[in-house]
Amino acid sequence: MKLRIISGSLKGRMIKAPDSNLTRPTTDRVRETIFNLLHNKIDFDGISVLDFFAGSGALGFESISRGASNVTFIEKNYPIYKNLLENIKSLNLEESCEIVKSDAVQFAKYTTDKRFNLILADPPFFQYSIYEVVKYVFGNNLLSEEGYFIVERSIQTLKKDVEGFGKEPFKRIGDTCLYEFTKSTEAKPEGD
């Protein structure tokens, strides 16, 4: 399956979605909504982006296309990691992209020396480690003062997610729910 970059300097370029039942690429409609919402909040020029559960890298590539200076992709599955590496090479983005082959929770838990202006997470819908990721992002101060952290989830996990994040989604698009976190609206995930 091929995905297209929606806007910016890479508009229309195609990337390959991994051949895996472990990923569910963010649809064009959801990506467009996310970035239209962010466009009103963030100046993308020169920002640093973190893309958890990176998969094809579509969210990170949209960020680069709109002006982000660099993206750190977090992906633990080796075949998906390899696909992501191929996408980076096909777009000639080796200098502005880094892939960390790691579990998202482990990266968030043990990274203490980096700050990101934008953090994006599109975990598998029925994986609940995202609550720990959010907790460690704020516990380790990974989000910059004026930064945004957007998490994509399914309407099917709404009740558990509202409990886990301590907040309602800020946007619903079909069966997708988006949660927004900032330093001023920091979530209080379960276990705190």
What are these regions (language model features)?
Residues 1-192:
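Class I S-adenosyl-L-methionine-dependent methyltransferase catalytic core
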